[in-house]
From Swiss-Prot:
Name of the protein described by the UniProt record: Tol-Pal system protein TolB
Location(s), subcellular: Periplasm
Self-association state and partner proteins as the record states: The Tol-Pal system is composed of five core proteins: the inner membrane proteins TolA, TolQ and TolR, the periplasmic protein TolB and the outer membrane protein Pal. They form a network linking the inner and outer membranes and the peptidoglycan layer.
Source species, domain of life: Bacteria
Keyword Cell cycle part of the UniProt annotation: yes
Family: Belongs to the TolB family.
Signal peptide: 1-21
Claim: Transcription regulation is one of the keywords in the record: no
Organism, as annotated: Shewanella halifaxensis (strain HAW-EB4)
Protein function: Part of the Tol-Pal system, which plays a role in outer membrane invagination during cell division and is important for maintaining outer membrane integrity.
UniProt keywords, alphabetically: Cell cycle, Cell division, Periplasm, Signal
Length: 440
């Protein structure tokens, strides 16, 4: 670990914050077109107050996914039930929902609790009320023992199960995001933070009086690469989020920027200007061996790995303006991908490798866009302003990005089809440079 100058104080710590969301998610568009679902409050089978209501987490997750719209609790024809035996199909005949989530929580000794839940096919119950046994209505049912500290985590797990069973797509509710918070009035205004995807369980990894930027997750979700100016110059670090051990990977003169892990987690694609113009390089994290990828008089920057690890998506000005290109590592062959709009930059690749997400500038407006790599159809997803830094959820359904709202930098989210939109404001300061973790 590098010895810092006397003028600098950098705080490295994992500092768990109070149990509240540091980033509040405000849904702004798309809930009306979501699929209706019913989540019955889980039944508490103990004495005294329940530690936490898991069903609140499930309802919030499903609403924030943009795919589902949980029904209001007061509109449900049955409440206080937790098993199929208590489910009255006839009472739900007119309920506009495709499934019902219900469950129970009971003490299991010490600080442990037994949580049970069932996912009921309401469409089948309504269409064929007498043609099958009651058990045929159960899409999934599970029970597990957890501690009080695991209530939110297990709520996310239930949401993952519900989402995958009803959509066929793996849920991404047990994921995290990394981002940079800036409070200009503080002595050390820059903080590298991580939190659950919904803003809860926020932790600070690094605090510095100098800028921090461009966090990027390793494929195993255990490390972050980022750029720090803590030594009054740009340097790239890799830090283990659990042990706090970190390594200085590059510290060349000039630009050291835009780090992103390779799919195997052994290398970083980075932007360096050590040889003149900003170019894209690949750095072996263990050996520090460097391979130059691009060699052009124009600026090449912002690399992102395709899932096979054989090529990179980059932003290049070799055509006169920033556009997205694909460069193959073995051959060096490079091809331009984007042509619409004035600029296209800051690209990310969907987990399936079939589409790219990026910042598009048209008529002077910066918005998040998506392009299908086979058809080359481009769709602008957002209508906010000064959008930047898109990062895709590991299941490919949502994009988190930086934008400006009421004069402040905030985070926002949009579904991959552009239908659902949400804003993630923070209580104090500004937030930027989001990065969505892999599945954890």
């Amino acid at each position: 670990m590098k010895i810092f100058g006397k003028w600098l104080l950098v705080t490295l710590l994992i500092c768990s914050m109070p149990v509240k969301a540091a980033l509040d998610i405000v849904i702004t568009e798309g809930i009306d077109a979501a699929r209706p679902i019913a989540v019955i409050p889980f039944v508490w089978q103990g004495t005294g107050p329940m530690p936490s209501q898991i069903s609140d987490v499930v309802m919030s997750d499903l609403a924030r996914s943009g795919t589902f719209s949980p029904a209001d609790e007061l509109s449900l024809p049955q409440r206080g039930i937790s098993t199929l035996a208590q489910f009255n199909a006839s009472a739900w005949m007119t309920q506009p929902a495709e499934a019902v989530v219900m469950g129970s929580i009971k003490p299991y000794g010490g600080d442990k609790y037994l949580v049970s839940f069932e996912l009921i096919d309401l469409v089948k119950a309504q269409l064929q009320p007498d043609s099958q046994s009651a058990q045929d209505l159960v899409i999934d049912s599970r029970e597990t023992i957890i501690t009080a500290a695991q209530f939110r985590q297990y709520g996310h797990r239930i949401s993952d199960v519900v989402y995958e069973k009803l959509t066929g797509i793996r849920g991404a509710f047990l994921t995290r995001i990394a981002y940079v918070v800036v409070n200009h009035g503080e002595k050390s205004p820059y903080k590298l933070m991580i939190s659950d995807y919904d803003g809860y369980n926020e932790q600070m990894l690094l605090r510095s009086p100098e800028p921090l930027m461009s966090p990027s997750w390793s494929p195993d979700g255990q490390r972050l690469a980022y750029v720090s100016f803590e030594n009054r110059k740009a340097e790239i670090y890799v830090q283990n989020i659990y042990t706090q051990q970190r390594t200085n990977v590059t510290s060349f003169d000039g630009i050291n920027g835009a780090p992103v892990f390779s799919p195997d987690g052994k290398k970083l694609a980075v932007t360096l200007s050590k040889d003149g113009q900003p170019e894209v390089y690949v750095v072996d994290i263990a050996t520090k061996a460097i391979k130059r990828v691009t060699n052009h008089y124009a600026i090449d920057t912002e690399p992102s790995w395709f899932p096979d690890g054989k090529s990179l998506l980059i932003t290049s000005e070799r055509g006169g303006r920033p556009q997205l290109y694909r460069v193959f590592l073995d051959s060096g062959k490079i091809s331009r991908l984007t042509f619409e709009g004035e600029w296209n930059l800051g690209g990310s690749i969907a987990p399936d490798g079939r589409s790219i997400i990026f910042v598009n500038r048209t008529n002077g407006k910066f918005n998040i866009a998506r392009m299908d790599l086979e058809t080359r159809f481009m769709q602008v997803l957002t209508s906010t302003r000064l959008d930047e830094s898109p990062s895709v959820a590991p299941n490919g359904t949502m994009v988190i990005y930086g934008t400006t709202y009421q004069g402040k930098q905030v985070l926002a989210a949009v579904s991959m089809d552009g239908r659902f939109k949400a804003r993630l404001p923070v209580g104090q300061g500004e937030v930027k440079s989001p990065s969505w973790s892999p599945f954890l």
